[in-house]
């Protein structure tokens, strides 16, 4: 997938170049040229690291799926119990997503 600058739509780069560069030369953000559709039923059947790799892989097409899966497992593996975070109730209808690895939320 290619990414274009928000300040110059003719400035198009690969995902890896957008990540390495951060901002485009003229100070714009890099955004994807399209937003892939996700099969919700299929994606929900995956564990969190697999889900993350599958979704991110649709945007970072110049990285191998194997690399993305290993990165997702390393990021969301044992330290997170395979989850992205913990939803803690704040009130009856409000929850906060805790994004740390402490077991204090258990």
Residue ranges, per PLM feature:
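Short amphipathic alpha-helical surface micro-motifs
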Residues: 1, 11-14, 77-84, 104
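Charged, compositionally biased N-terminal leader segments and the immediate start
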Residues: 1-26
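Small-residue-rich anion-binding loops in enzyme active sites
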Residues: 26-99
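Conserved small/polar residues in nucleotide/adenosyl-binding loops
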Residues: 100-106
């Amino acid at each position: 997938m290619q990414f274009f600058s928000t300040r110059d739509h003719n400035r198009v780069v690969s995902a890896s170049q957008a990540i390495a560069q951060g901002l485009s030369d003229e100070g714009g953000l890099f955004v994807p040229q399209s937003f892939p559709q996700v099969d919700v039923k299929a994606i929900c059947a995956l564990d969190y690291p697999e889900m993350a790799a599958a979704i991110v892989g649709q945007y970072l097409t110049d990285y191998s799926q194997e690399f993305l899966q290993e990165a997702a497992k390393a990021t969301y593996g044992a330290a997170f119990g395979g989850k992205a975070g913990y939803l803690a109730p704040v009130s009856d209808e409000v929850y906060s997503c805790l994004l740390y690895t402490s077991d204090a939320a258990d």
